[in-house]
């Protein structure tokens, strides 16, 4: 392959690469309402992955249905949630802890912006930056982000201008 051909083979940025992996991880989700994946990274190495679903060993929503409850967001919006589901970010943090991987000052890539509960946990774990693909209720986490040292960055789709 000549130099010109090599230049024409565009490699994804590291951010796009890890975000693509979050989408693959999300395919393992057993949630009927959303497929979310998370990848915790430090120095371009994956420390842990997680997807949303039931706790290990318990029945999945895909098998027995969801256990839905209502909650009210700080903005007054009523939201439907599932008792059974653990979010992707929490599963990734749990996997890191079980495997002895320290995640302080690491970054997390998530298919969607974290919910307010996951954001609070991410702040406490010392995650440095949250990279996400799709916004999800971004307004509910904006105030909390403003007071934390955690950065949040939307990764543009592959092929989008930088």
Predicted feature locations:
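Zinc-dependent deaminase catalytic domain
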Residues: 1-162
